[in-house]
Amino acid sequence: MTLYLVRHGETAFNRDGQGLGRKDVPLTERGLAQAEAVAGRFATVKVTRVLSSPLARALTLAGLVAARHQLQPEVMESLTELDIGETDGMSFAEMRGRFPDFLKTWASDDGWRARMP
């Protein structure tokens, strides 16, 4: 068995430097083109299942890949993005101003200890 992990394409939050967690933000036009390109790369790969987060940005990509193989994506809640609390949708500049200690910990070797505000 081979498992491929694929990240969704660009969203407005990614493009604009905003934190993105569980907000259901769709792909931009560029992100959709990226998703279509990924689906094209999987056209010749044997795919028997496509699993996805329920968020639109991931489900769009999963749907494109699955369609190439006459499959339907299977939604798994456990694949939902990390809940980033108050920082969801916030610019990194705003995060630095409001939560400097959090960002310092998050960027450190002990980043796994960081608690989302």
PLM feature spans:
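A generic secondary-structure signal marking the coil-to-beta-strand transition
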Residues: 1-2, 104
